[in-house]
Amino acid sequence: MAFKAVFLAHAPDAEPEKHGCVIETSKYKLFVVVVKDQDQAVEVCKKLVKEEGIHSILLCPGFTHRDVAEIAEAVGENVAVAVARGDGPSSRVSMQVRKEQFAPKPSEAAC
């Protein structure tokens, strides 16, 4: 039996059905999925746990503590949920890039 894990990341233009892949060996099966928001994240996690028997969920640094808790509650105590956070300097670099890339452009901002 292979160990099954999913890595989830956020992007404002994500479509989980389209933006994902699976990497598989005889001992490890890794699902990678990009989601638009927390609602999609919860639904994707619940679906993969039910349909694929996921053992571990790894979340990108953009997930908040509340997001992590909500996902952990949704998938149950038999699934590990962790966040890929680095040290202080690494986290700041990641946060700055996400702010620059994901912030609405002036032309995209609501009137």
Could you describe each region identified by the protein language model?
Residues M1-E17:
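N-terminal basic/disordered segments at the start of proteins
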Residues E43-E51:
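Short, well-structured alpha-helical segments in soluble
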Residues H65-G86:
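Alpha-helix-loop-beta-strand connector modules within alpha/beta enzyme cores
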